[in-house]
């Protein structure tokens, strides 16, 4: 089904050039890990690739002054966002609202791979534990 959400004549194209940058290496069987600050490519979002093969492992409890979205690419995770505990699997997308403490861990079995989208041109974080 075709989408026609706006009239392109009412919103002129952005004059920025297309940009390509590498956030992580995909060669070999190892987990994808890396990041790319949005400001490096003129974007409003910073992208992180996170992965672990260890059950129970994940980022420590932390908070940002902006929203963070998570896309589970592979495996199963348990997210702790504010007072919520949310189980997620490959294909799920989650949101940690600005100012809400959050963390996640590999719920297994196998590898957990996520793409984490910081809705900021740079990564700003305070660890809470």
What are these regions (language model features)?
Residues 46, 76, 84-86:
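Well-ordered beta-strand scaffold positions
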Residues 38-39, 58-64, 105-107, 126-127:
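Short histidine-centered beta-strand/loop micro-motifs
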Residues 33-34, 48-64:
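Conserved short histidine dyad/triad with adjacent acidic residue
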Residues 61, 79-80, 96, 102-108:
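Short beta-strand His + acidic residue motifs that chelate non-heme Fe in jelly-roll/DSBH
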Residues 66-67, 72-77, 82:
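Glycine- and acidic-residue-biased ligand/ion/polar-headgroup-sensing regions
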Residues 83-98:
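Short acidic-glycine-tyrosine-enriched beta hairpin
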Residues 1-45, 127-129:
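A short, N-terminal "cap"/entry segment at the start of jelly-roll beta-barrel domains
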Residues 49-51, 95, 109-127:
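A short hydrophobic beta-strand segment most commonly corresponding to one strand
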């Amino acid at each position: 089904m075709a989408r026609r959400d706006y009239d392109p004549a009412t919103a002129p194209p952005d004059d920025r050039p297309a940009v390509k940058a590498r956030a992580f290496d995909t060669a070999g069987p190892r987990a994808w890990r890396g990041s790319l600050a949005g400001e490096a490519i003129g974007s409003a979002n910073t992208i992180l690739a996170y992965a672990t093969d260890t059950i129970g492992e994940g980022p420590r409890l932390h908070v940002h002054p902006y929203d963070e979205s998570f896309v589970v690419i592979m495996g199963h995770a348990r997210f702790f966002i504010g007072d919520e505990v949310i189980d997620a699997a490959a294909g799920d997308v989650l949101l940690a609202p600005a100012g809400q403490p959050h963390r996640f861990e590999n719920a297994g079995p196998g590898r957990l791979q996520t793409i984490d989208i910081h809705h900021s041109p740079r990564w700003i974080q305070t660890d809470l534990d």
